Structures are given as C-alpha cells and as structure tokens.
Design a protein with these regions (language model features):
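Amide-donor transfer/coupling interface in amidating biosynthetic enzymes
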Residues: 2-4, 8-11, 17, 21-44, ...
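Glycine-rich nucleophile elbow surrounding the catalytic serine of serine-hydrolase chemistry
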Residues: 79, 83-87
C-alpha cells in the first residue's frame, strides 16, 4: 500500500489517479490528520508528498514524515513535497528565479533515474510554483536528478 499525503492541493487527486493506475492500493491522508505512529502502523511501501500552498515548514506532518521514514521507505515529493524533502535534509528553499504558474517548460534529466524511466532525456512538463530548492545549498545526501532549462532543481 502507498500513502499520498495531501497538502490541501487540488492536484493531489491527479496524483492519486496516476499512482492508482499503477498500484490501486493507495490511501490519501491530509497533512494534519495523521500521526507518524498511524503511518507506521499502515506499513506503506512508499509515501508521496503532494503539492500544496505555502512553504515546507507549513506543510503539516511532511517534514517529520521525511525525517522519520527517509532511508526506510521510498518518498517522492512533488512541488511542496519536493521542497519539504530539501528542507528536512537541511537544504534551503527560496524564491524561484522565475515564477511558474501553469507554464510548460523543458526539463532535463541528469544521468539515469528510475523515476524518469521511459522518458526522453529532455521532456516538457507543467510547472506551477513560486519557490525552488537552491542547488548551491543542497546537502550532499540529496542528488539532483533533473533541472529546468534555467537550471533550477526539479
């Protein structure tokens, strides 16, 4: 079973449908309606942290989830979830070089990564964010696997 932590974002259920098309055993939980102990009892195979409004430190249980389960359970962060992973490991999130609200831009893979399996090295993706993880402030535990055409961490 997979867990999708919903950070109160309408895109969460798009993720739910996509993940469910691969593995229908998925449970959605709100970022302020579940505890670490409850997540542990559910024994998820993977955790996905959704997009959402605000900054990572305002994303409910996301940073505690990352700190508790990183290295034990695969965790994927999308937008706000991605930023929460950055901050949980001691990285810095700041304003993006350019605000991206519903714009399509080219994303460039860096090396091979299972997450992007089957996609070309460069592919178009929708971007919708005002914040970004700062590459120069990433801890060495985190590896950049994709960048935008302007060099921001994806």
């Amino acid at each position: 079973m997979n867990i999708l932590v919903d950070n109160y974002d309408s895109f969460s259920y798009n993720l739910y449908q996509l993940i469910g098309s691969v593995n229908p055993d998925i449970q959605v939980v709100r970022n302020d309606e579940i505890s670490l102990g409850e997540i542990e009892k559910l024994a998820p195979e993977a955790i996905v942290l959704s997009p959402g409004p605000g900054r990572p430190e305002e994303a409910g249980i996301c940073i505690p989830v990352i700190k508790e389960f990183a290295g034990k359970i695969p965790i994927l962060g999308v937008c706000l979830g991605h930023q929460a992973i950055c901050e949980a490991f001691g990285g810095t999130v700041s304003y993006a070089k350019e605000l991206m609200h519903g714009k399509q831009k080219e994303i460039h893979q860096i090396g091979e990564n299972q997450l992007f399996q089957g996609l070309p090295g460069t592919f178009p993706a929708a971007r919708y964010h005002s914040l970004a993880a700062l590459k120069e402030k990433l801890p060495e535990e985190l590896k950049v696997t994709a960048e935008s055409e302007d060099g921001e961490v994806m």
